[in-house]
Amino acid sequence: IPTGIFTLPEIGRVGLTEQQARDRYLAAGKDPQQSVRVGRFRYGGLGKAQATGDIQGLLKVIVDAESDRILGVHILGAHATDLIHEAALAMHLGATVSRVAEMIHAHPTLAEGLMEAMEDVHGHAIHLARKPSS
């Protein structure tokens, strides 16, 4: 069930948190480090976020490493309560993270961030915004 928290910034979430996923695999006798993959993408890497000034935010995807199925998605940032529904639909349909990452997203949009976070699960995101090094 997708959840929206209408704070500033907004929070959108669906499915398991990273810790919940790791705990479940550990309880099942599996190595949580090998069983769970995580992809992240910062709003700062999105052209739309740059244009609107909404660069503070993060999209996080939690995935079953063996099946590539999405276990949870968490978004913190502008329009997170709207963006979470694409992830909820993908999970409802049993889509793999690879299938969602392959879907073409309009540019420039905040929704591209979900695609990039999905791509990051397998190290394929190309627009990652890195924290400045000191």
Question: PLM features: residue spans?
Answer:
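Flexible, glycine-rich terminal cap/loop adjacent to redox cofactors
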Residues: 3-17, 22-134
